[in-house]
Amino acid sequence: MSLFLLLINSVATFFILYIFRRKIMSLIAKKTYYFFQKFPVKSNRAVFSSFSGKYYSDNPKYLYLECIKNHPNIECIWVVDDNRIDIPGKAIKVRNKSFKHLYYMATSKYWIFNARIPAMFTKREEQVYLQTWHGTPLKKLGLDMDVAYFATANYKHNFYKNAQRWDYLVSANKFSTKVFQSSFGVDKDIIVECGYPRNDILINHSESDVLKVKNSLNIEGDKKVILYCPTWRDDQKRTDKQYGFNLKLDLCRLKEKFGDSAIILLRMHYLIADNLDLTGVEDFAYDVSNYPDIQELYIVSDIMITDYSSTMFDYTNLKKPVILYTYDLDKYKDILRGFYFDIMNLSPGPIVIEHPELEDEIEKGLSGKLTYNEDFYNEFCTIERGNASNKILNTMIS
């Protein structure tokens, strides 16, 4: 019994010290940031971050590339979790949550992010905060959600307060502009409706760009490429920031049927924690979840499979086939999130529930018998012109 009590006491002590340490570190960070706010804001400095430092990717990446090309006087700072993340140009990399991170947040005129940031980062009057966000929403978002499985008690309040710091919010289409006003609680005046910077490459890419990506992934030139991009499920939370995912693809069956002429790239959502077991299908299925830029995966693929992910909106810009594999459709739309529109009436491509149906649609897609939905394209993709990055920076840097 005494050994058991000793163990319990040890565990309790560990957690108390852990919580205490986190609170102390948080307090130090806040005080340090407040101190750095006494320094002047540099008018030619911009700080970038993609998914809170996890990647060099998405809208911030393409705004950065535009910035170093056409605004060389801007000093660019990139917030990263790992200093090994490769960033071209002369950007200064700073570790997320480091003192340098706090300093540059306090002294950079421009903030360019695609996800929410901690509440401690109060914005000074002369600073400009561009929130690019990271997708056209099918799933209900923020203030529009009836139930948030992953949320804290103050989720909606914090969500709203976070959005009130934004000076500009990027929208890819009229639909998003309307949704963002209700889901974020922002005025239409701050929304820049011009397409997504990350989609510029989808409009402007060349065949050499495609070959470069294929070579980096060791994809044989004559093989067709299937891209699978599922989203995360709100009710499969594993840890504070990670979710599980039960892969519903029969990869052995798909290899047997399509392995001679195609491969499949598996791109899991960044919130999904599971490692994929590809035993037996290593020469057919490839886990590209950590590939830094999903846009590059779009341009090398011939067909995409997704479910409720915003990838469907971006990918349709390529006018390539999209299949929605929605094996849990009723649960997802009615219980977990809810949708902004009826996906059954307006879809980028065929919706399938069962695996045999999926196989049939893949076969059609690979043989050229499946096309994109023009109505879906016209609703969500028509303002993309390949110049969103240029328009946004010209609006922001005046």
Could you tell me what each predicted segment is?
Residues 94-110, 116, 270-313:
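Donor nucleotide-activated moiety binding/catalytic core segment of transferases
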Residues 385-398:
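C-terminal alpha-helical cap of glycosyltransferases
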Residues 43-44, 127, 223-226:
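Nucleotide donor/acceptor-binding cores
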Residues 111-140, 291-336:
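A donor-sugar binding/catalytic signature common to diverse glycosyltransferases
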Residues 57-71, 197-278, 352-354, 388-390:
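Conserved catalytic-core segment of nucleotide-activated headgroup transferases in glycan assembly
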Residues 281-283, 310-380:
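Catalytic binding pocket for nucleotide-activated donors in carbohydrate/polymer assembly enzymes
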Residues 46-205:
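Active-site and donor-binding regions of nucleotide-sugar-utilizing enzymes
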Residues 1-47, 51-52:
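Membrane-proximal basic amphipathic "stem/tether" segments
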